[in-house]
Structures are given as structure tokens and as C-alpha cells.
Amino acid sequence: MNAIHNSQSGNLRDKTLDHDSTQYAALVGIDWGDKEHAFHLKSDDGTFESGTLRHSSETLFQWLSKLEERFGSRPVAFAIEAQSPPLLAAIRQFSWAVVFQIHPITSKRLRTAFTPSGAKDDLPDAKVLLDLLISHRDKLRPLPEPVSPKTRILDGICRERRELVDQRTKWCLQTRAALKAYFPQAFELFSDELFRPIVSKFLARWPDLISLKAEKSSIIKRFYTSNGYRNVALIDQRLEIIKTSIAIEIDPSRISEYTRKVKHILERIELANRQIKELDLQMSTVFKEHENWQFFRELPGAGPSLAPRLLCAINMAPENNAQGMQKYFGTAPVKEKSGSRVWTHRRWNAPRFFHQTWGEWAGLSVQHSRWAKEFYEQAKARGKGRYTALRALAFKWMRVIARCLETKTDYNEELYIQSLKKRRSPLAQHL
């Protein structure tokens, strides 16, 4: 693979500008509601105004167009809470709009600081957001320019796939619980994960032990062989299990209840399998439309599902330098001090999906990278828990990847190990 090209995923830069010194034509705080949206506005001449907008895209776009005409397309800063994606989508269609996305906890704490009674109203909430822009803009970071549509599409596919996998896992656990209650021998009859097609076929044909024991051994044996089983000794062992098994549940009403439940859950699992397969095809296609897809695909342990997630994570981060990535993705620790007490903990408000992506990939990289395995084992030997060790490993990986993207070179395991030895890193002693 040749050296990676300079594209969005390889362009190592701070994706935000210095908006602290920007002269805005107006500052606007908007509180998103179900039926209407409240706003507070301060123009550059010092005047304030407030109002509400009916919940409709037409009303919102009409209002934004009036702001564009009123301020002559000069920059206008908007403060909105992070939980209002439709509002964000509308505002970002105007090139003069600069969006500061406020975490709900931030606005809540500022509101309660001045209203300890707990009173809450949309107009005051919009004013709180405006106050943050007026008094604390130096501590806020504007949203970076939107990433390319194909990256957003890929990110959506990755997230949808993960949701389906999580849902399928939940259904598999429900199936396992039901089988334990009336047909525990099933777990000895197939070693596959419960979402595998052979499990659905098996339980659709023999949903309980009674129907299975009534079947001829030759037919059961043919079922195994026709579904890819070639180990004759294993098949004979399972036939013997069937022959000697005793049903734990013989009440027809209870068996009917359990088999019906398992049937319906397996139907959902089969549908999820088909949907995941479709998403895998779409994900592969869109992933390969990105110029640097091979760079991510060849990272140790980054398979067909994790490599696209890593690409999206880096492309959608506000900054692609190592320190910015480590903070944004939540691998950089936070130190708190109160009096004589000092403690360190992980960052709580990192983007969950991206944080999860880095943790999962770090775990897989241990199986495919010599130095990553050594790093993980040394961390465990120092008493670190699994997730703390993986988070530290992800922290390390971000430095490596950021450097590769900065220099526009591919990751090379052997070259990196040589670098560790040259620097006399503690990792190099056992490599």
C-alpha cells in the first residue's frame, strides 16, 4: 500500500478557528421545544430581543432568512443545547452561522446557580444560553465545519449496525434464558452462537426435547451434516446426549409458552441478521469511497466493521492532533483537586460511541500487535483493570495514528517497534 494521500481523514489540523475574537453581528441563544422554540438575541449595537418560534421548518427557515437579510450575512453566533439535532441541521445550512453546542449539564448548572428554586422556563433557558455566549465564549468551542456527506452516511451506517448488534445480543440473552427454563440440553447440541442460522433451523424443527427425542437419529444426523458439520464423532456424541436426556419440563402449556416465545425471538434475530448483512455491504461500499480507507483497514485488529468506525471517529473529531483526540474521545485522564485531596478519573462526557470504538479496537489490537499486547500486559501487571488498561492503550494508539496522518505514512508495526527500541522504551525490553 502506498503512502496515504492528503484527504480529510489525513489532514491533521485543528478544525476550528479562533472565534473568540470574531466580531459577530449578533449572539443568539435558542432553547428547542416540542411545540415552539424560545430565543434571546443580542445584536452588535447592544440591543436585546426575545421571542418564540412555532415548531415548523418553514417558520424556522423564514426567521433565519430574516436574520441573514438583517445582518447582511455577517457572522452570527448561535448557542444551542446538544440535544437539538433538527435545529442544528437547519442552522448549519446558512454559511454565516457559527454554532456553539452547549452540553445540557452546563446550561443546567448555570441556570440552577441563579434559580436555586428549580424553576424552569423556555425563555429563561434561552437567556442562559445567550449569557454563556456573552460571558464565557472564550471557554466555548464552536462546532467545526461539517464533515463530508459520505462520512456522515458512513457514520450513520456504523451506528445503526451497532444498535442492531446490541439488540440482537439482547434477544440472544432472552432466548438463552427461555431455553434454560425448559430445554437446557439445547446448549450441548450446538456450539454456535445463538444468532447463527443453524440454531434457528434446529429450534424451528425441534423446539423442545420431547419432539427431538421422537425424531429418528438418522434424520438428526442428516441435519447436522447438511449444515456443515463434518465431525462424525461430535455428531454421534450429540445423538447420545439426545438419547439419554430427560425433559425438565413436561407440562404442555408451559412448553407451548416457551416454544412460542423462542420462535418469536428467533424471528427477530433472523431479521436482524439480514439487516446487519445489508448494512455490512453498504458500509463496505461507502468506506471504500474514502481516499484513506486502506490506511484504517490495515491497522492491527481493525476489521471490516471497526475500520470504518475509526475513520469516522477521526474525521468527525474537532481536532486531529493527538492531544485534541485524546481529550475529545475521553482517553486522556482528568485530575481533580479539592483541598489536600487529589484524584484522577476518566472523562465522563466523551462521545459514547466513539469512546466505545477506541476501546473495542484497543482490545482487538492486543491480539494483532506485539507492542500493544506488551503494553496491555504491563498495565495489568501494575494492577490496572481491563478497561483502564485498554483506555490507556487507546491513548497511546491515538498518538501513533495522529503521527501517521501528520506525516502521511502508513502504520508499520516493525518500524514502530524499532522506534521503541531506539528510544529505550520500557515496552521494548520484551519485544
Question: How does the language model describe each region?
Answer:
Residues 1-431:
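A detector of single, family-specific signature residues
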